[in-house]
Amino acid sequence: MKQSFVKIRKITESPYSDIWAYPKGTKSQIKSRIKELENLGVESILFQGKLEINTINVLGKGYVGIVVLGKIGRKKIAVKIRRNDSPRKNLKKEAELLKIINKLKIGPELIASSKNFLVMEYLDGEKIGDWVGGLKKKGSSSQLKIIIKKVLEDCYLSLIHI
């Protein structure tokens, strides 16, 4: 079955609306977060990913937030949603850190942010842990060393060219 993006305004009923204020939120919180996300320019969401939360597929879930696939116009984006039970009161500090590393050409580009959301460039690809786990053939340790060296060089070069 082909999945399609759903307009944010239509994601107001459980179980999909539960993602806006995970793990538990009031109707008022959900409505407020939908408005907050619309103000950031996000138009639609696609619930896909290998991780499942209460029958809903997402790209990722962590201690602070949940990440889903979204769209602004025709551009796919990653949307980090602050969990209601997060020890952080907002995502402001994380947004500031992303802006700093973006100047060094590191990490996904931060497109927009608010108290409860980070809207970032969507980077499609294999998770690094899965990629490393898949390195079982001859010569893969040297391949891994080359990649790690390149990443570290890129980070260093970005730092000295500020």
Q: What do these predicted ranges mean?
A:
Residues 2-50:
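Juxta-kinase regulatory segment immediately upstream of eukaryotic protein kinase catalytic domains
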Residues 48-58:
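Conserved N-terminal boundary motif of the eukaryotic protein kinase catalytic domain
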Residues 57-91:
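ATP-binding glycine-rich loop module of kinase domains
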Residues 80-114:
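A conserved alpha-helical element in kinase catalytic cores
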Residues 109-144:
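Conserved structural core of kinase catalytic domains
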Residues 160-162:
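Conserved small/polar residues in nucleotide/adenosyl-binding loops
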